[in-house]
Every structure is written in structure tokens, then in C-alpha cells.
């Protein structure tokens, strides 16, 4: 006979406000990792049109680049990739024992650098879209 696990109050949704920077770094790293995996499948699907012929591949790329939403998704992809890389480097240093006392600061620095790179790249990605 098994007993069910008592998880306590399910409606205790306010716990996320108590998360530390390390928990947010873990959540964002997992989320960005899944987004990058999803992008990888999409990227392979688009590249597979090149196996048909060059004209189909060119037509697919031109069709995607003409959509404004794709331009914004590219900016989001850059933000996801930059954060994932910077947080991965932060985790590498933490695993090596470097900067253990400054983990929170390193996480916030990764967020700030990601935001700066993303904002600086917006004109490049949206050039010619309007």
C-alpha cells in the first residue's frame, strides 16, 4: 500500500519571490538550454531544404527573413545564446572554485552584459525590416 506525497499548500505561489540569484541562474540556464535545443531542431529543418535544391533553400531563407517576427526571434535567440554562454562560463569558474563568494554578482553581471549586447544588436537585426 503506497501513500501519496503531501506537497503542502499548492496555492503557495509566492515562494518564487524568495528565490536567490543562484536559483534564478539555474532556472534561466535550464530555460535557455531548452530554447537552444528547440532552435537546433528548427535550424536543421531549415537547412534540410538545401537538400532539395539551392532555389528552395534560397526561397525559404528569403521568406523567413521577410517576416518581422523572425527578426525579433533572432534578437531573442541572441539574448538566449549570450546569457547561456556567460552563465556557463560563470558555472565553470564556480566549479573550479574561482569566485565562489561573488556568484550573485557574476549572475547579475551576466544579465547586464546580455542586455547590453542584445540592445546594441537590435539595429543590426532589424535593419531593412521596416
Swiss-Prot record:
Heme binds at residue 84. Part of an enzyme complex containing four subunits: a flavoprotein, an iron-sulfur protein, plus two membrane-anchoring proteins, SdhC and SdhD. The chain crosses the membrane at residues 26-46, 72-93, 104-128. The heme is bound between the two transmembrane subunits. This is Succinate dehydrogenase hydrophobic membrane anchor subunit. It is a multi-pass membrane protein. It comes from Natronomonas pharaonis. It is found in: Cell membrane.
Amino acid at each position: 500500500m503506497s501513500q501519496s506525497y503531501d506537497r503542502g499548500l499548492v496555492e503557495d505561489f509566492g515562494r518564487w519571490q524568495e528565490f536567490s540569484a543562484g536559483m534564478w541562474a539555474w532556472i534561466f540556464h535550464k530555460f535557455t538550454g531548452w530554447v537552444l535545443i528547440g532552435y537546433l531542431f528548427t535550424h536543421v529543418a531549415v537547412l534540410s531544404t538545401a537538400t532539395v535544391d539551392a532555389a528552395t533553400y534560397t526561397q525559404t531563407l528569403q521568406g523567413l527573413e521577410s517576416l518581422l517576427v523572425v527578426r525579433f526571434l533572432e534578437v531573442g535567440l541572441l539574448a538566449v545564446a549570450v546569457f547561456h554562454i556567460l552563465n556557463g562560463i560563470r558555472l565553470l569558474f564556480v566549479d573550479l572554485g574561482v569566485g565562489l563568494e561573488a556568484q550573485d554578482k557574476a549572475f547579475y553581471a551576466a544579465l547586464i552584459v546580455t542586455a547590453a549586447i542584445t540592445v546594441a544588436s537590435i539595429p543590426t537585426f532589424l535593419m531593412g525590416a521596416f
